[in-house]
Amino acid sequence: MADPTPQISLPNNEWIELKNVSANPINLQNWRIGDATGQSGPMPNFVLQPDSFVIVCTGSAVAAMQAYGRVISVTSFPSLDNDGDQLYLKSNTGLTIHAVSYSLSWYQNAVKSDGGWTLEMIDTKNPCSGISNWKAGTDARGGSPGIKNAVDAVNNDQSAPSIKNAYAIDNLNIVIVFDEPVDSLKGATVTNYSIDGGLNIQSAVSISPLFDRVQLKLTTVMQANTVYNITVNNVTDCKNNSIGSKNKVKVGLPVDPTVTEMVINEILFNPKSGGNDYVEFYNRSNKIFDANKLYVANRNSSGVISSTKLLSTLPYYIFPGDYIVVTEDVINLSLDYMVQNPDAVFVVSSLPSFPDDEGDVILLNSQGAVVDEAKYKDDWQFALLADPNGVALERIDPDGISQEATNWHSAASTAGFGTPTFKNSQYKLLQSINATIEITPKVFSPDNDGRDDIATIQYKTTEPGYVANITIYDANGRPVRNLVKNATLGLQGYWIWDGLDDKKLKLAVGTYILFTEIFNLSGKKEIFKNVVVLARQLN
């Protein structure tokens, strides 16, 4: 119980419940509870029987909590942070028995995370799985101290551990971060790791208390501006699931970016109702940067840089060609847009204000120097947008000037109006202005047999700002389907036709003409006529 207020029914006290999941009695004498800031005094002489519970709290809470089960108190009981904390349980010999690092997201319930409800483990036979094995309590009192958790259920861990990222402590020491705790012995086996670039590993140490990190010590130093690749094999999690395909990670020595080595690449300043702003940055250099040493900011009404926010509270390297996104709510972002690389999205509480009409987005390095700045305006969006809400503003050319309106364009509708964590839909690749339309296959049979059921209309343009309309005609020249209407285009994309008309009725077999009109506000216009045959198998 990290946040007992507002009270539901349980006492207004913080506490931690322990369960003996072994087959033997355990004497908790001299065991300790701790968090990131320190640890408690020793526990008293208390024997916890198998499959039994005990509530641990401060001395002042004992009387209130005794109504719910057996209770022991400790001095210097850790203050359980409402928003999240790292907790560990250590034996009388100092051995870490269990550790968790909870956050508000672990409640998996926006109402209950606001207080008054316990955070409960679902399956005590699966103690290392983190958020996937915890949720808010469901007992009507707000929790179930001293008895089996109300959320108790079988929740087997069958997922392989994977690597989240890696970072360098210095030029001889690397830390690999896994997405869950790994077996400390296998994590500390040097032969389970290899690194390219002529580097050899001297030692591997599993880092307590969570054991989700391993520190590698090298025999030779890493070189600047060099990307090294680490491969991990035979490392397992607590349930002996072996690491799978996500067993490779890049590492190197980060530096501070100078002007425009890293750029503002995409801005959502006018989100959908209930949504959140986001900013995407792109590393256009051949260097490595650390998000833990970069800041996003804006300018106040006096033109002074203000509202400075760190991109990441933990080390996260941005390699050449990488993207990173900051927002206030990663769940909202994933609901509103396709996020190809969730690990590259970082939550920044209270982002700087980015007004809907105009504003400043600034990227600062660790010295406070401006790396890039974009002074956007709402009229930088595509003029024919029916509704600009939820439409991200994308940089066209990473090598172009950040302050030029012509280097920005609305994200394409065919890309979902935003491309956080991956290449912009309006990214400029070529200088010519031609467009192409191609249909595959030339003959399709929409009978749901899994073979050529749809016709795919692929397009390519060589500059942003185009709009497309597609009308499908039968062989007699009659319009049967308005497939696309005023769709803003990226540089490439596609639509599909399922062989149905505007009323979603099957069309007859035969030849159909797809009439495609592509135009922009500068008066450029291209017309395409493509033929496709709709066929069906004979019964």
Describe these PLM feature segments:
Residues 400-435:
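Short, compositionally biased serine/threonine- and acidic-rich segments at solvent-exposed termini, linkers
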Residues 145-147, 417-422, 485-488:
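Eukaryote-specific, cytoplasm-facing alpha-helical/coiled-coil scaffolding segments in long proteins
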Residues 135-147:
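Extracytoplasmic Ser/Thr/Pro-rich, glycosylation-prone low-complexity segments
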Residues 20, 417-419, 469:
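A detector of low-complexity, intrinsically disordered, Ser/Thr/Gly/Pro/Ala-rich segments
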Residues 428-539:
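Short loop/turn motifs at secondary-structure boundaries
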Residues 1-130, 137-140, 153-404, 430-440, ...:
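Activation on beta-sandwich/Ig-like modules and their edge loops
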